[in-house]
């Protein structure tokens, strides 16, 4: 048995790393392409260089595979030099780094994007300067538009599902939350998934105090569960037999199935998802290279490569060919996305100051308290 489990783990890990990369793939050192001067707190450099903050796998420079070097190609074709490329594994790491120093461009998720806009740390983008912007799905474009101003260029997106070992348990969503053998994403936004499972909330990101309490109560049922930050933990959990359920993406279900694990997805009427978008820093004195980067990452070819590499879907519909077709088919398109509640930073459009809804700070406190139990 141990030998079979070891083989399954090795196979899953090899597929994970070598097959298609990985969404927020295996940890790799932060890359500084060339020595960069110490940044000033007021502005980034304006000498034809770029300073980028993104997730691992979103802007490859050949460190994982010499055949995957988008940064090098960008530099050759545009004449702009990437002076600093900081990569992170989690949204929390990205928020922490973005608060420490300025960047020209950041690939932010919905919670951080809203914070950057609210704190005036991101500047509006002129979509007329971004070739291919209109090729991006309108629903994604609308998510990055605030008061008529565009603040982000949608890049990659995905959604969550609950997967389970079909030889051990049945597909029951509330049982998944109650189980000690379940792995949930380590994020306050997981409260939205609990709200969907509870079924009392109309919008999982606009929760009243009572709805928040009900969602957290559902999460508190199990004190022995795992909270993951790296998706590789999911692969290890199912490969070694220590997990019965997990919150994952369709991509990781596919990886486990290819590794011979009998995992299936729970069928739910609604689920949560997210869109990562490229944003422009507020203190960029010369945006020439920043806009060249935005044009580069909006193009179908760039999004096609990234989607196939990290196991997510491209925001540009024209990228759904060739290498990325499998990801587009896996996540779905068109009306299939109507069941996805795409994340916003709570309370979304609801007014927290009136007491109608709970804000993200409250979610964060409840999440921290949950992990401490």
Where are these regions (language model features)?
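Conserved C-terminal helix/tail region of periplasmic/extracytoplasmic solute-binding proteins
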Residues: 342-373
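A bilobed periplasmic-binding-protein/Venus flytrap-type ligand-binding module shared by bacterial periplasmic
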Residues: 161-168, 196-200, 274-287, 297, ...
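C-terminal region of N-terminal signal peptides and the immediate post-cleavage residues
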Residues: 18-46
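Mature extracytoplasmic/periplasmic domains
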Residues: 281-346
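Periplasmic-binding protein-like
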Residues: 135, 158, 212-221, 257-282, ...
């Amino acid at each position: 048995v141990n030998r079979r489990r070891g083989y399954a783990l090795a196979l899953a890990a090899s597929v994970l790393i070598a097959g298609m990369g990985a969404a927020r793939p295996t940890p790799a050192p932060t890359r500084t392409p060339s020595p960069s001067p110490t940044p000033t707190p007021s502005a980034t450099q304006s000498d034809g260089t770029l300073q980028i903050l993104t997730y691992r796998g979103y802007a490859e420079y050949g460190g994982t595979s010499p055949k995957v070097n988008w940064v090098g190609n960008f530099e050759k074709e545009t004449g702009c030099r990437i002076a600093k490329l900081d990569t992170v594994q989690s949204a929390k790491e990205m928020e922490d780094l973005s608060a420490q120093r300025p960047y020209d461009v950041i690939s932010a998720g919905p919670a951080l994007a809203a914070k950057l806009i609210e704190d005036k740390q991101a500047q509006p983008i002129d979509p007329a300067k971004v070739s291919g912007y209109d090729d991006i799905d309108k629903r994604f474009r609308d998510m990055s538009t605030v008061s008529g101003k565009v603040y982000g260029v949608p890049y990659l997106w995905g959604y969550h599902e609950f997967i389970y070992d079909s030889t051990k348990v049945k597909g029951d969503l509330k049982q998944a939350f109650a189980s000690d053998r379940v792995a949930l994403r380590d994020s306050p936004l997981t409260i939205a998934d609990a709200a969907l499972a509870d079924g009392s909330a109309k919008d999982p990101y606009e929760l009243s105090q009572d709805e928040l309490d009900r969602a957290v109560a559902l999460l508190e049922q199990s004190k022995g569960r795992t909270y993951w930050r790296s998706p590789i933990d999911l692969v290890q959990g199912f490969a070694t037999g220590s997990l019965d359920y997990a919150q994952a993406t369709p991509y990781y279900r596919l990886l486990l199935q290819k590794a011979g694990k009998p995992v299936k997805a729970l069928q739910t009427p609604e689920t949560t998802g997210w869109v990562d978008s490229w944003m422009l820093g507020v203190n960029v004195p010369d945006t020439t290279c920043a806009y060249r980067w935005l044009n580069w990452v909006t193009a179908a070819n760039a999004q096609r490569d990234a989607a196939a590499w990290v196991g997510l879907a491209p925001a540009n519909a024209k990228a759904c060919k060739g290498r990325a077709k499998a990801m587009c088919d896996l996540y779905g398109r068109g009306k299939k996305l109507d069941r996805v509640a795409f994340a916003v930073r709570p309370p979304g459009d609801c007014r927290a100051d009136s007491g109608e809804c709970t804000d993200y700070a409250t979610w964060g406190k409840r999440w921290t308290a949950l992990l401490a139990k």
